[in-house]
Regions:
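Conserved hydrophobic/aromatic "anchor" residues
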Residues: 61, 70-71, 85, 99-100, ...
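A short beta-strand-turn-helix
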Residues: 62-95
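Short pre-active-site segment immediately N-terminal to redox-active cysteine/selenocysteine motifs
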Residues: 93-95, 100-103, 168
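Conserved hydrophobic packing residues within short motifs/helices of P-loop NTPase cores
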Residues: 95-97, 128-130, 173
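Conserved redox-active cysteine motifs that mediate thiol-disulfide chemistry
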Residues: 99-116
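Thiol/disulfide oxidoreductase modules built on the thioredoxin-like
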Residues: 141-149, 154-206
């Protein structure tokens, strides 16, 4: 049975535990904030490097496959579509990297153009969608609605969003065969812009 003298000790111990828990939480939040700031800074530098035509290497990622339809991919690369896709494993082929979300109206506007371009360049150019800030169920409905004919992966956090310096959706990056970014489009992409980026990606590996 607790004595009156032991009760203050228990309260003191409980207070210490609560303070330590609060400090741990604050420390974790600060670490997350620092990580976001650093990543966002790296993303900004990446965008600036692309703007200056420095052809930086695209930040690597390994993300879960949301949509495994690889019918427009070269047959030799279709075995890469498992539970996850690693960007660096796609080197050797030009890549159109499209960041999107199901709630994004401009993403819906450009989706048919991406599907058409993927079909036109079947076997020559890899189209890869990256779904961000979205629900998986809504994203799959979007992909079914537009009969998307290329693979999409999903980032449930903000890693790729920050690493690529995204300022909104959609955004598209064009990678050459060496994994270097040769073109970048912010916002809804037109057919002309899409073909121009693909031309740069096809020629950029030389």
């Amino acid at each position: 049975m607790e004595t009156p003298s032991s009760q203050p000790e228990h309260r003191s111990l409980l207070g210490l535990v609560l303070r330590l828990a609060a400090l741990t939480l604050v420390g974790g939040l600060l670490a997350l904030l620092v990580w976001r700031v650093v990543n966002a800074g790296q993303g900004g530098r990446l965008v600036n490097a692309v703007r200056k035509h420095k052809k930086p290497i695209a930040p690597d990622f390994r993300l879960g496959v949301l949509w495994p339809h690889a019918e427009t991919w070269p047959r030799s690369t279709r075995n890469l579509v498992r539970s996850k896709v690693e960007l660096r494993s796609l080197r050797g082929r030009p890549v159109v990297l499209n960041f999107w979300a199901s709630w994004c109206i401009p993403c819906a506007h450009e989706a048919p153009r991406l599907v058409a371009a993927a079909k036109t360049h079947t076997g020559r150019v890899l189209f890869l969608g990256v779904d961000v800030k979205d629900f998986s169920s809504d994203a799959r409905k979007f992909l079914r609605r537009f009969h998307v004919n290329y693979v999409s992966v999903r980032d449930g956090g903000s890693g790729t969003y920050d690493a690529y310096g995204l300022t909104g959706l959609p955004e598209s990056y064009f990678l050459d065969t060496r994994g270097r970014i040769v073109a970048h489009k912010i916002g809804e992409i037109s057919t002309v812009e899409l073909e121009d980026g693909i031309t740069q990606a096809l020629g950029g590996g030389r």
